[in-house]
Design a protein with these regions (language model features):
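Active-site pocket-lining/capping segments in soluble small-molecule metabolic enzymes
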Residues: 1-115, 125-163
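Residues lining hydrophobic/aromatic ligand-binding pockets adjacent to catalytic sites
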Residues: 118
Length: 163
């Protein structure tokens, strides 16, 4: 099964990308993400997915728990996360099956994907920095994996000669 997932920058992009065939909209929310170009208000979040790819310090666990509660109230589709504390607290709110592990550059093998799937999350997003051959091998071994096929990716973390 193929799903087209789009990270939007502007709310005005939602309807046009849905009309073009997107199955899922991802939004960056203020205080939930460190990398989204545009950070929306939590009030804009309804029945979409959220990019929650920041790290939480020990003194921010109450903030994290409240953010997860807010997302549950808004019927979030998926939560893209990289900090394991998100998984830990999502269990208490029955949100684990909404989680997508997206640590940008760390998911590089079928074992990485299997580790998180065994914990009940929806799926993992493969690193966009691995080769096409590596990606194909993982896709042959594991079902329901997210692969970035277009867009701006974090190239500064790669040690490969990309340019």
């Amino acid at each position: 099964m193929k799903n087209i997932v789009v990270l939007i920058n502007e709310l005005s992009e939602i309807q046009p990308v849905l009309e073009k065939g997107a199955n899922e909209i991802v939004m960056g929310i203020k205080d939930y993400t460190f990398s989204a170009i545009k950070k929306h208000s939590i009030d804009d979040m309804r029945n979409h997915s959220v990019l929650m790819n920041r790290f939480y310090f020990p003194n921010e666990m109450d903030l994290l728990k409240q953010q997860l509660k807010d997302l549950k109230e808004r019927n979030v589709n998926h939560i893209y996360f990289c900090d394991p504390s998100v998984y830990y607290y999502a269990k208490d709110l029955d949100l684990v099956n909404h989680l997508i592990y997206k640590p940008d550059t760390l998911t590089v093998s079928a074992n990485d994907v299997a580790f998180w799937k065994e914990r009940g999350i929806y799926t993992s997003s493969l690193s966009p920095l691995i080769t096409e051959e590596e990606t194909d091998k993982i896709l042959d071994e594991v079902e329901n994996v997210e692969v970035t096929i277009h867009g701006h990716i974090l190239m500064s973390a790669s040690k490969r000669q990309l340019l």
